[in-house]
Curated annotation (Swiss-Prot):
The lineage of its organism: Eukaryota, Metazoa, Chordata, Craniata, Vertebrata. This is Integrin beta-like protein 1. It is found in: Secreted. It holds the Pfam family EGF_integrin. Residues 1-23 form the signal peptide. It comes from Homo sapiens.
Length: 494
């Protein structure tokens, strides 16, 4: 059996769906009409009274002048999808500001599009406490973005929460860490967001159909289907999954800023010249080990050379497989990914850099240097990429003194991360500095809060062996560039 009022509930739901987006005041009774389209059971005066704000005299605007009155219910005019105006159409906006996914940050109530904050909180989204019990260090730590920058350099930190710089009143800088800047979407000519042909989200324009460009400034004269067809590569992928399709043309992801066209090219980005480069080729403009021609990612070798990358001379008495095996040593890569293998012998790169050496280039003394270029913190010597510390010092880079001049309490206070946990629970504290667990080689950072597995790899090596992983980002050594320090921008070597 259906519960009492079920039919009336269906009538109400049908009425609301028919009317569009609307709101129902608490005084509304679902039995005011017997069925949709039936005569109203209220008098005209009573219907209009219910559509006026309390205390307003007869003759005052119904539904605040923003809707029509239908049997005591305001049917509000919908100006934009997602914008509502309340039971009596009294609100200009219905949706309130959010912070970290919560309306009014969970510290207030939404009233007509504006947050009414609980006592002890303030801000557009009630996100700022009036009294702060955090230390400045903890507060700043909570305000750092994934690049370890406080409020993305676009705001100030207030008790662990970012207050974005919107002094011009535009409100275009926002986000938990002020990481979004919608000023980037303003078209220079029209001064409109996305040229008036799209929506901006976190500094990026999302264009309406038929428009494209960084700021939706260009109009496309072909259909989306035709655009997709022109961008489809021979293997059936859009721009070979290595580019972006814009109005039927592929813009390939250029990974080599020094190249004339980059390593990826072709009408549908089907050619990847990186497949022609040996590890050591990145030190020069050579493809195919300097002994062949690269044609759309495949090497055509000169006479006297063979191999996938023309790396093996036919004059060598070893087979290509034997040559590579001799050059690998204990590494999975020939010459440890740091040199050129030719007939079973390694030539370490960059040439002339004495910090890279060994039979299979297994020693890399650059690993003993910190980001400032200091070897073993100035308290040790480097031996095959590892620090041998002087007496009284220890650590991967000899950065920790064995003697400490502070109390245990002082030391622990300096080792607490933003959440109050000592070294993020992944290390021990010594003299105010965290020593991350040796068992988990990938844990690093001031508070052991970073995971070096997040750093990009190339040729199977983190940061390609040409930089240091710092909190998930590669810090490249001089002469190197790229997300994984895979691009050589230094001098060309013979």
């Amino acid at each position: 059996m259906r519960p009492p009022g079920f039919r009336n509930f269906l009538l109400l739901a049908s009425s609301l769906l028919f009317a569009g987006l609307s709101a129902v005041p608490q005084s509304f009774s679902p039995s005011l009409r017997s069925w949709p389209g039936a005569a109203c059971r209220l008098s005209r005066a009573e219907s209009e009274r219910r559509c006026r704000a309390p205390g307003q005299p007869p003759g005052a605007a119904l539904c605040h002048g923003r809707g029509r009155c239908d049997c005591g219910v305001c049917i509000c005019h919908v100006t934009e999808p997602g914008m509502f105006f309340g039971p009596l159409c009294e609100c200009h906006e219905w949706v309130c500001e959010t912070y970290d996914g919560s309306t009014c940050a969970g510290h207030g109530k939404c009233d007509c599009g504006k947050c009414k904050c609980d006592q002890g909180w303030y801000g557009d989204a009630c996100q700022y406490p009036t009294n702060c019990d955090l230390t400045k260090k903890k507060s700043n730590q909570m305000c750092k973005n994934s690049q370890d920058i406080i409020c993305s350099n676009a705001g100030t930190c207030h008790c662990g929460r970012c207050k974005c710089d919107n002094s011009d009143g535009s409100g275009l800088v926002y986000g938990k860490f002020c990481e979004c800047d919608d000023r980037e979407c303003i078209d220079d000519e029209t001064e409109e967001i996305c040229g008036g042909h799209g929506k901006c989200y976190c500094g990026n324009c999302y264009c309406k159909a038929g428009w494209h460009g960084d700021k939706c400034e260009f109009q496309c004269d072909i259909t989306p289907w035709e655009s997709k067809r022109r961008c489809t590569s021979p293997d059936g992928k859009i721009c070979s999954n290595r580019g972006t399709c814009v109005c039927g043309e592929c813009t390939c992801h250029d990974v080599d800023p020094t190249g004339d066209w980059g390593d990826i090219h072709g009408d549908t980005c089907e050619c990847d010249e990186r497949d022609c480069r040996a590890v050591y080729d990145r030190y020069s403009d050579d493809f195919c080990s300097g002994h062949g021609q690269c044609n759309c990612g495949r090497c055509d070798c000169k006479a006297g050379w063979y191999g996938k990358k023309c790396e093996h001379p036919q004059s060598c008495t070893l087979s290509a497989e034997e040559s590579i095996r001799k050059c690998q040593g204990s590494s999975d890569l020939p010459c440890s990914g740091r040199g050129k293998c030719e007939c079973g012998k390694c030539t370490c790169y960059p040439p002339g850099d004495r910090r890279v050496y060994g039979k299979t280039c297994e020693c890399d003394d650059r690993r003993c240097e910190d980001l400032d270029g200091v070897v073993c913190g100035g308290h040790g010597t480097c031996s095959c990429g590892r620090c041998v510390c002087e007496r009284g010092w220890f650590g991967k880079l000899c950065q920790h003194p064995r003697k400490c001049n502070m109390t245990e309490e002082q030391s622990k206070n300096l080792c607490e991360s933003a959440d109050g946990i000592l070294c993020s629970g992944k290390g021990s504290c010594h003299c105010g500095k965290c020593i991350c667990s040796a068992e988990e080689w990938y844990i690093s950072g001031e508070f052991c809060d970073c995971d070096d597995r997040d750093c990009d790899k190339h040729d199977g090596l983190i940061c390609t062996g040409n930089g240091i992983c710092s909190c998930g980002n590669c810090e490249c050594w001089d002469g190197w560039n790229g997300n994984a320090c895979e691009i050589w921008l230094g001098s060309e070597y013979p």
